[in-house]
């Protein structure tokens, strides 16, 4: 059995701000049946320690970036959880990355360097008579680990860095080299220096044995200037060691309340009632998203007439950019077929995916995306931009896709308002072709969106790395 330590800054069900947490939480169970024994290392935030009360201390660390720390043992479902209990770094009010003022904690570089140091310590010395063969590092927060492994003289433990979102690069000023206990001779363009600053993400990309991201298309995109956000050259240099493995979803946690597409009707009616939308002979489209430009929702505002003029409706759940919040509120006030709920409500999001006919994901870039996978699972047809994981998970209702009977949704490209308008018009036209729509719903609900294929891909990669 390959021994793997997953090093992450967040993990469901303990703490979550984004999709990274879903992957970190799902992989241990998904890999258990693939011959991989994965354990997880997390920072000791209050929520994590609270869920693992009175856990045994496995290791004392006298000084870890300004204070004492301990490695504790907990549980993550059936998987072993290691907790880095460092109160001076993690026991504080606010979010896990942001303070109560909404700004990054100024000591974030030290906080997550500590996580990397703890991972390197476990790799070097083991814990509980267990020592990993592979460290699975998630995003910049775990990116310095390969450097600390080098410093510890560890040569027999391999590292995989998974990039969940290239936009977060773990930048710190150069004067922090000493504070972060980093070797000055690696602070150069071939190392972890990035435009005069330290980049923890670049450190991981350059020094990890392998690099992955969360979909094959996003892997290709990241090696281009349009999507690479300055890291495209570094990733292109690692192209032979860089791969894309799709995320999955927990099929038990996301189980539709109906077995066939016909079961959607009462949920659609209930959702219309909940949002105050009138009954109409058109598709009920839903958006469950952060309201940001990255998600392409400014384009949806511009393209909205195409949906409404063709009899469609829109229900939106989310929050984010104040300008977009105001734009959707204005649209809801003007049009009976548009409704908005600001904020996030997990139970409501599930009711929306169950009751909606289509889920709109017009993102400008999307590493993998989860909402379109939920839509497929529930027979709520995804309308998506042709980018990242959206391109890899939805089969377009093109003439060929419909003729072959394999379509599961609607894709559009390029990602602009005019093309989105045409896609919305096409979606509404398909709605009025009941046989085609029914076939697409059947295809969507049968489409494999769980972790099985992804877990096999990770297991094969880990096994090859450990050999």
UniProtKB/Swiss-Prot annotation:
Instruction: State the GO CC annotations.
Output: cytosol
Q: Give the intrachain disulfide bonds.
A: none
Molecular function GO terms recorded: alpha-1,4-glucan glucosyltransferase (ADP-glucose donor) activity; alpha-1,4-glucan glucosyltransferase (UDP-glucose donor) activity
Q: Which residues bind ADP-alpha-D-glucose?
A: 16
Q: Which UniProt keywords apply?
A: Glycogen biosynthesis, Glycosyltransferase, Transferase
Q: In which pathway does it act?
A: Glycan biosynthesis; glycogen biosynthesis
Under InterPro entries, the record lists: Glyco_trans_1, GS/SS, Starch_synth_cat_dom
Pfam family name, one = Glyco_transf_5
Task: State the EC number(s).
Answer: 2.4.1.21
The name under which this protein is listed is: Glycogen synthase
Organism source for this protein?
A: Paracoccus denitrificans (strain Pd 1222)
């Amino acid at each position: 059995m390959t021994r793997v330590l997953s090093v992450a800054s967040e993990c469901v069900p303990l703490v979550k701000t984004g999709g990274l947490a879903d992957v970190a939480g799902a992989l241990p169970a998904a890999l258990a049946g693939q011959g991989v024994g994965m354990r997880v290392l997390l920072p000791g935030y209050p929520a994590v320690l609270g869920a693992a009360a009175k856990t045994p201390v496995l290791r004392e660390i006298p000084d870890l970036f300004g204070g004492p720390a301990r490695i504790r043992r907990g549980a993550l479902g059936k998987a072993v959880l290691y907790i880095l209990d460092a109160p001076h770094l993690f026991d504080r009010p606010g979010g896990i990355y942001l303070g109560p003022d909404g700004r990054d904690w100024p000591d974030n570089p030290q906080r997550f360097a500590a996580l990397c140091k703890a991972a390197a310590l476990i790799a070097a010395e083991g814990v509980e008579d267990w020592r990993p063969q592979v460290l699975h590092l998630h995003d910049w927060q775990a990116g310095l680990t390969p450097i600390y492994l080098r410093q510890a003289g560890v040569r027999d433990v391999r590292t995989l860095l998974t990039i969940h979102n290239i936009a977060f690069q773990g930048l710190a000023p150069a004067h922090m080299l000493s504070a972060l206990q980093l070797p000055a001779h690696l602070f150069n363009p071939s190392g972890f220096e990035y435009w005069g600053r330290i980049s923890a993400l670049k450190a991981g990309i350059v020094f990890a044995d392998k690099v992955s991201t969360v979909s094959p298309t996003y892997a290709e995109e990241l090696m281009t200037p349009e999507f690479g956000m300055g890291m495209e050259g570094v990733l292109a240099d690692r192209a032979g060691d860089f791969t894309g493995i799709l995320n999955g979803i927990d099929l038990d946690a996301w189980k539709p309340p109906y077995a066939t597409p016909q079961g959607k009707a009462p949920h659609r009616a209930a959702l219309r009632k909940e949002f105050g939308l009138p009954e109409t002979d058109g598709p009920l489209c839903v958006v469950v998203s952060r309201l940001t430009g990255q998600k392409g929702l400014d384009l949806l505002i511009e393209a909205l007439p195409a949906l409404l003029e063709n009899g469609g409706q829109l229900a939106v759940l989310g929050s984010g950019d104040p300008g977009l919040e105001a734009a959707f509120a204005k649209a809801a006030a003007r049009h009976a077929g548009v409704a908005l709920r600001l904020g996030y409500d997990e139970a409501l999001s599930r009711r929306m995916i169950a009751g909606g006919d289509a889920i709109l994901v017009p993102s400008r870039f999307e590493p993998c995306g989860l909402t379109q996978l939920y839509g497929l699972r529930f027979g709520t047809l995804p309308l998506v931009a042709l980018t990242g994981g959206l391109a890899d998970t939805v089969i377009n209702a093109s003439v060929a896709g419909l003729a072959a009977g394999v379509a599961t949704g609607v894709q559009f490209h390029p990602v602009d308002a005019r093309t989105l308008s045409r896609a919305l018009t096409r979606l509404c036209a398909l709605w009025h072709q009941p046989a085609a729509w029914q076939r697409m719903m059947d295809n969507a609900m049968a489409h494999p969106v769980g972790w099985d294929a992804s877990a096999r891909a990770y297991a094969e990669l880990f096994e090859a790395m450990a050999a």
